[in-house]
C-alpha cells in the first residue's frame, strides 16, 4: 500500500495545535511529535519541525532515526537529508555562514538568506561523507544547491518570525527552480513572497 501523505503532519499541527485537540496530543510541539512518532514508521522518510511562538519552543523528529522527538536548544541548527545537525560538509558550512550573517545583521533580508542557500559549489573529495552511493553522485549531492539532469533543488524558502508585543509577524520568501513537472528550469524562474501578522496567545 502507498504510504500516507506527509503533508497532513504539518496541517494537523497548524490547524489543531492551538486548540489542544486529540486529547491533548497537540498541546505542545514536543507532545505533538511524540504523538506522530507512535505511527511514524508508516510514512516515507521525513524530518519534521514544529514550533509554538508563545512557548518559545521548537521541536524536531525524524522517522528514520532511533532518536526520540526533542526540543531544540537555542542557537543555529541545520538539517540536510539526514538527522538534525549531521556533520555533512554543506550543513556545517551553511550553519556557520548563517551564524556569521546573523551576528552581523540579526534581521537580514529574506533574499539574502535564500542567496546563502543557493550555493552550487561541491565539497572536496576528502570532505565527502560516505553514504554508500557512487563518488560522482556523492560529489553532486554535497552542494547546498543541487544541479543534475535527473535530480536537483526544486525550491528555496526563507521564513522569518518576529514579535512586537502581542503581534507576531511572519514573512516568507521563496524562489522556485521547478515548473511542476520535476524538470529543472532556469534558476529563479518563479519567485514569490508574502507576510502576515498573528495575534498571539500568551500561555
Describe the role of every protein-language-model region.
Residues 1-203:
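N-terminal nucleophile
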